[in-house]
Amino acid sequence: MLNSASHLLLVIVMCVFAGTSSFAQTAPGKYWVRFTDKNNLPYSISHPEEFLSWKCIGRRDRLGIGFDERDLPVNPDYIAQVLEMGAVSLHHKSKWFNAITIQTEDSLVIEAIRALPIVAEVRSTHSDIITGQSHKWDIESSPSNELRSTRLCDTFPEYGLGWRQIEMLNGQWLHSLGYRGAGIDIAQFDAGWNRTDILPAFERLREEGRIKGVKDFVWNNDSTIYGLNNHGTYVLSIMAAYLPGQLVGTAPEANYYLFRTEDPFSEYPVEEDNWVAAAEYADSLGIDVINSSLGYSLFDDPALNHSYADMDGNTTRCSIAADIAASKGILVVNSAGNSGDDPWRYITAPSDADDILCVGAVNADEEHAWFSSYGPSSDGQVKPTVSAMGQAAAFAALDSSIATGNGTSFSSPVIAGLSACLLQAFPYLSQQAIRDAIVRSASQYESPDDALGYGIPDFVVARELLLTNEPAFGDFEMSAFPNPCNDRLTVTLADAKNCAVAFTVYDAAGRHCADMAGIVLTDGHGVAFLDELVKRLPAGHYTLHAHWELRNSFLSFTKIKQP
């Protein structure tokens, strides 16, 4: 358990940077340095390939998201001027905030940096004050047989103890349709993934090479990712585990990036800087989903503490960054926090961000979990956004058993994983469209409250909402038969009859796979036979884009292997 001054997230401390003014008395540690402008850069938004991956550029192009000044890197000359001031080392760069985080033990250097004409502000983000927050990653375990005796399922036995947390949201039906997150990139922000490199729960993940990258934003020591802390292991297993009959995660076929942003041994605003740096890096890679089972409100140095008034989505750096990430096309999913039974009571940053999914926790009976933080945000937004099972939730333990535990850190990956499955089904849709469908599918959509938000989503309903409203995301309705198909596919596009139509196919990751141009739909019903197109494709899930006369239509289809 955490001490009384702590605010649980997974049963972790949740703290946030206090937006106070620069301190007259500085101390050894880390500092946030924000610059005045981005003048005289050696980069241009007309050449984004110089600082963004092609996957990121492709996603932006596909979703119609442009490039702006925030995408441009920090001026390297400005960074050099700061580092030349004395005993200063660079911790992070933030292009979204036009800032850097530095480390120094010389307070005189900080005053000299403040005086530079290129510097807009300097704030302390870390000092040497420690108040005993070392227990922030404790897990409150409950007996495994709590689920074993009542929640196994004969119809879907592969889920084992994880059955109820998936079934509650109808996630098993997305899986049965073949949507298990394949081709979707999920970045997990956490503290450590102890034994993830050897645990059986992640064997298939490792063998298939779907841990695509790791990065340590705390100590810049990637070799320690698979050690130091267990929290990330437990959270990852809820999404990625594959132990049929014991535990299958919500997105067992997705790709994963493991980013350490949390220092498990202290609590300071620099962890927000780490979060920002990781979010920017995720965007540059073209990541689709961020799961962050983290939150910030109180710090080891009380002078840096946040207030509930700061939980307005527009004050803390990590909350602002979460919204920027969403605007760049990333679906951000964050734990609401575990302060429901504490004096703090409310959600913490970045869960207060406007355009993300803030996830609360319920028990197996779909009742508010006693620890789950309450909303609203201080500016009146409905928070949490949605809720999922986080009390007695099943996860992979370090001894290779399946354990259960409490925390919104466990409900968040349930939602993040199933959201990835929905993105797989609709890869051409924006994160906002996916988020809105999830919210609209929830059990309390018409009457949200401060405990569960809009309620518990139903991912079958979310899929149906997206299918029903598909023409709204293109211009005109298109249907396909058979779907799933093998080497034959016929589409009907009534609005394009007697027109020349160009067809383009994208895979689940949004990559261009094949196209056919100039297909004239002369049939009276606007029918096109795309057998030659689908014959070129391997088995998998695809999006078909039809384009004619400045008009567009989209649909999802699946190609299966020949029997």
Feature-to-residue mapping (PLM):
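Extracellular S/T/G-rich loop segment that most often corresponds to the catalytic His/Ser-adjacent loop
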Residues: D190, S351-Q424, Y428
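Subtilisin-like serine protease catalytic core
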Residues: T26, S44-I45, E121, G162, ...
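C-terminal subdomain of the subtilisin-like protease fold in secreted/lumenal serine endopeptidases
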Residues: W163, L285-N291, Q424-S479, N483, ...
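Short acidic, glycine-rich surface-loop motifs adjacent to enzyme active sites
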Residues: E280-D312, S335
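Inhibitory N-terminal propeptides of secreted protease zymogens
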Residues: Q25-S144
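C-terminal outer-membrane/trafficking sorting elements
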Residues: F473-F481, C485-P563
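Hydrolase catalytic cores
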Residues: L236-M239, Y257-D263, Y346, G390-L452
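Protease zymogen maturation seam
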Residues: A115-D185, D197-A201, P302
